[in-house]
């Protein structure tokens, strides 16, 4: 018997208990970083989500698109600014974010998933009042002073009705991280934050964050210090001590939101690894860092 065929059979056998465990369960996937840019990685993620759907899981996708927003902003003469990993969003930048995230990125993901035979539906947080937003009041971690980030929002509430209706009917929701505030004002919300809030509201079994890092490191400058498992208490301690920087702050804050909302496990995995989503969900070893209560 060909060894390659035997290896494939072993992989399928290893996946069986995970398929059984997660069939019928909701898994929220935050899709961002390099996995959105490279064609081969993008194709792998779409295949992974399709397989999850075909084996009976209920995936919900929340996507980013920051690099594309920055690129269009620069083309329009606006230099992107960030504070503690959050994009400063004036009225012009808000309009650009909507154009890119809702009008372009969301459509592309839906198209790719539909090409895999998945019934995907594109949404933003504005649709059916899915994500109610409140203006984010931010205190700089560097200076301790309040900083006006413009139309940057926090998730005030998630209306799960539309998501439950779609997933029950066999659709895969694909959500752009734009929320709606009082008077219909749109707000730019960090995609990690949205993913954490939706995972909590939907009582998801898992939240998986696809990122451009291997996971969480004990020493951010030492690749060999990757942590396979961390607790919510450790994360809270790191945030309080100012140990975290940049985009890792909202990522780990969203992990806490999800866990406190009833999600069992959160995984931060390297989206630069082809099929990392399948490796995390359907293999014994998994990849990246698992955050638990």
UniProtKB/Swiss-Prot annotation:
Pathway given in the UniProt record: Amino-acid biosynthesis; L-arginine biosynthesis; N(2)-acetyl-L-ornithine from L-glutamate: step 2/4
Chief place where the protein resides: cytoplasm
Pfam family for this entry, one: AA_kinase
InterPro entries, per database record: AceGlu_kinase-like_sf (IPR036393), AcgluKinase_fam (IPR004662), ArgB (IPR037528), Asp/Glu/Uridylate_kinase (IPR001048), Glu/AcGlu_kinase (IPR001057), NAGK-C (IPR041727)
Gene Ontology cellular component terms for the protein in this record: cytoplasm
A GO biological process held by the record: L-arginine biosynthetic process
Taxonomic superkingdom: Bacteria
Catalytic activity line of the entry: N-acetyl-L-glutamate + ATP = N-acetyl-L-glutamyl 5-phosphate + ADP
Gene3D superfamilies, sorted: Acetylglutamate kinase-like (3.40.1160.10)
Organism: Symbiobacterium thermophilum (strain DSM 24528 / JCM 14929 / IAM 14863 / T)
Keyword field: Amino-acid biosynthesis, Arginine biosynthesis, ATP-binding, Cytoplasm, Kinase, Nucleotide-binding, Transferase
Site (Transition state stabilizer): 30, 251
UniProt-annotated binding residues for substrate: 65-66, 87, 188
EC number: 2.7.2.8
Protein name from the UniProt record: Acetylglutamate kinase
UniProt entry tagged with the keyword Cytoplasm: yes
Family assignment from sequence similarity: Belongs to the acetylglutamate kinase family. ArgB subfamily.
Job description of the protein: Catalyzes the ATP-dependent phosphorylation of N-acetyl-L-glutamate.
Residue spans crossing the bilayer: none
Primary gene name: argB
């Amino acid at each position: 018997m060909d060894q390659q065929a035997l290896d494939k059979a072993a992989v399928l056998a290893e996946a069986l208990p995970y398929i059984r465990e997660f069939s019928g369960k909701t898994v929220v996937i935050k899709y961002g970083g390099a996995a959105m840019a490279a064609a081969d990685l993008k194709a792998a993620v779409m295949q992974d989500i399709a397989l999850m759907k075909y084996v009976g899981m209920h995936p919900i996708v929340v996507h980013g698109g920051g690099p594309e927003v920055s690129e269009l902003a620069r083309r329009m003469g606006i230099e992107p600014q960030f504070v503690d990993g959050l994009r400063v969003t004036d009225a012009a930048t808000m309009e650009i974010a909507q154009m890119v995230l809702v009008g372009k990125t969301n459509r592309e993901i839906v198209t790719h998933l539909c090409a895999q035979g998945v019934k995907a539906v594109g949404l933003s947080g504005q649709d059916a009042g899915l994500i109610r937003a409140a203006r984010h009041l931010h205190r700089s971690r560097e200076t301790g002073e309040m900083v006006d980030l413009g139309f940057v929002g926090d998730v005030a509430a998630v209306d799960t009705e539309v998501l439950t209706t779609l997933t029950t009917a066999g659709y895969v929701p694909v959500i752009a991280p734009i929320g709606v505030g009082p008077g219909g004002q749109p707000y730019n919300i960090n995609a990690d934050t949205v993913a954490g809030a939706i995972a909590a509201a939907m009582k998801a079994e898992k939240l998986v964050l696809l990122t451009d890092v291997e996971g969480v490191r004990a020493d951010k400058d030492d690749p060999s210090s990757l942590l396979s498992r961390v607790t919510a208490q450790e994360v809270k301690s790191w945030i309080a001590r100012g140990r975290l920087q940049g985009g890792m702050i909202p990522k780990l804050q969203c992990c806490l939101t999800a866990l406190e909302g009833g999600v069992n496990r959160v995984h931060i995995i390297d989206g630069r690894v082809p099929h990392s989503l399948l490796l995390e969900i359907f293999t014994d070893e998994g990849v990246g860092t698992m955050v638990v209560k």
